[in-house]
Amino acid sequence: MKERKLLWQGLVALALIPCVLLIYLTGRRVRLPYADEMESAARLHGQVVAAVKAERLRRGYELVPEDRLALGLMGNQISAITTSLGSEEAKRTSQLSDFAALAVRYLHEAGVRPGDRIGACFSASFPGVDLAVLCAAEIMGLDIEYSVSIGSSNYGANLPGYVLPEMILTANRAGLLSTLPQLITMGGDGDAGENMMAYMLEDEEDIREIEEMQARLNEEGLFLTHYSQGFEADVLDRMARMGDIAAFVNVGGNILGMGDTDAAVNFGQGLMAPADPRIGPKSGLVERYLSLGVPVIHLLNIKQLCAETGIPYDPVTLPEPGISGVYYHRDYSRLAIGLVFAGAAIAILAIQLLSRQKREA
């Protein structure tokens, strides 16, 4: 009798497979209600990237061979300010304007509204995503208080003669972005550039290049902040500078954003689910804002973000704004879902009834 019951249960389970498939196939791809805003952010991002590319070329930096899309945000594999390893494919993908659309989507899903203040922590490892968040804030009419770091992994914004704060300044002077960074740090270990290649290799020429970069930034009014209060105090100072915020965005792996432990990695990507992490002296901004109930958007694992949102990963050609899956959600037939659940319920009740009749017989 037990074997017969298991057989019936197995048959019901098998019957449900095509039913679930039917639900998926009858689902419709529906454009998100704020897709026009997403598309506007993506088009602004395209303008910003074009301005940055033009300034990069003006400064004598040719595009790297790895930049197949010729967008101009990819740096060298290694430079004086390189701090860590990075994926060529991820860096190439992170230049796409779809990430500006994604930032708008996540901010809407986080409940952010025009006029709200948001905070952000940007690593130079993903300049395209940093600029994408700024474009989203610009289009949505948000007040954004943010910090940028200079150290970068492979193929990020690691050209000492044209670093991330200067890219933002280029867009600002072109009238494309209205808000400059509130805080600029060296990034890398200790948020002080301790693991930059120039210092690790004790290369005098590269160190001199960094010193020239620092002097140039000061001349441009992009002043570096050198923290020395200790990690926890530095994080709390960063939070105080941002004030009350409706959401926090972390791009890349800056130590103050991620914390001086591996804990933040466990909370996932994109718009994070509410969590209550245990806060300690080494907790970064991601954990601390999660603990306060502030929505956190974490943009680091580019491949995973693409898989989850429909942005093409490492495409051969540049996608047009408004086309990719990030602008859509799937709407499933309520009738089909209802029929499947009703059928499953009837089948389960039938199995129970047959089993009871067998026992009574």
Label each region the model flagged:
Residues 39-96:
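N-terminal, Lys/Arg-enriched amphipathic/low-complexity engagement segments
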Residues 98, 104-110, 114-163:
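Membrane-embedded segments
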Residues 247, 254, 261-361:
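C-terminal functional extensions of proteins
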Residues 129-136, 259-267:
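Short Gly/Thr/Asp-enriched flexible loops that form oxyanion-binding sites at enzyme active sites
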